[in-house]
A protein has these predicted regions:
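Conserved alpha/beta-domain cores
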Residues: 22-66, 79-82, 151-153
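Short, Lys/Arg-enriched N-terminal segments with co-localized hydrophobic residues
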Residues: 1-12
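C-terminal alpha-helical cap/extension of soluble enzyme domains
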Residues: 9, 18-19, 40, 118
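Alpha-helix-loop-beta-strand connector modules within alpha/beta enzyme cores
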Residues: 57-71, 111-121
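Short, basic, glycine/proline-bearing loop/turn elements
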Residues: 41-45, 71, 137-138
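Boundary/entry segment of secreted carbohydrate-active catalytic domains
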Residues: 13-24
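Conserved anion-binding
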Residues: 14-15, 77, 81-168
Length: 168
């Protein structure tokens, strides 16, 4: 019949690969977006701005609503600090956490996440960086692409050296 809506478009997908970035300044706006999207998306990214403004409660609220959470903080600090912070993010129920692609940072984050569902993503070079930015950091002799590849290879090598039980 004309004008009839097909309800099949409203059912949530069993696997939706989309992660929606909650790049908003506060939990009120973030949760309003989650409410508008309802069950069409089940995975959300909480970045530095929102996490700094609202803290861990924004992550636990999303998890309590049955959402998967990607905590995008790009951690880069000493071993024990990253290990403990990753453990705290894991305890919140988050699914993904970003850290710098240095072997020591990856190892620390994996130790902190051990025994949890938290997966670690290593960030090589920020997408906003260009050649001049790398040179400002003292990275010379490599293009942005080469730097990404070099850091990624180091991250993979570091992951391969992790003790059993810390791989994921």
């Amino acid at each position: 019949r004309a004008g009839a809506r097909r309800e099949s478009h409203r059912r949530p997908m069993k696997h939706n690969p989309i992660i929606v970035a909650l790049d908003v300044p506060n939990a009120t706006e973030a949760l309003a977006l989650v409410d508008r999207l309802h069950n069409s998306v089940g995975f959300y990214k909480v970045g530095l701005e929102l996490f700094t403004a609202e803290g861990p409660p924004v992550v636990t609220e999303l998890v309590s609503r049955g959402k998967q959470v990607f905590v995008d903080l790009k951690m880069y600090d000493i071993h024990e600090t990253v290990k403990r912070a990753a453990a705290r993010v894991a305890a919140l129920g988050a699914s993904l956490l970003t850290v710098h692609a240095s072997p020591q940072v990856i190892r620390a984050a994996k130790e902190g996440a051990a025994g949890s569902q938290l997966k670690i993503i290593a960030v090589t070079v920020l997408t906003s960086f260009d050649q001049a930015d790398l040179e400002d950091l003292g990275v010379t002799g490599r293009t942005v692409g080469e730097q990404v590849e070099w850091l990624a290879q180091r991250a993979i090598a570091a992951a391969n050296r992790l003790p059993a039980g810390l791989h994921s």
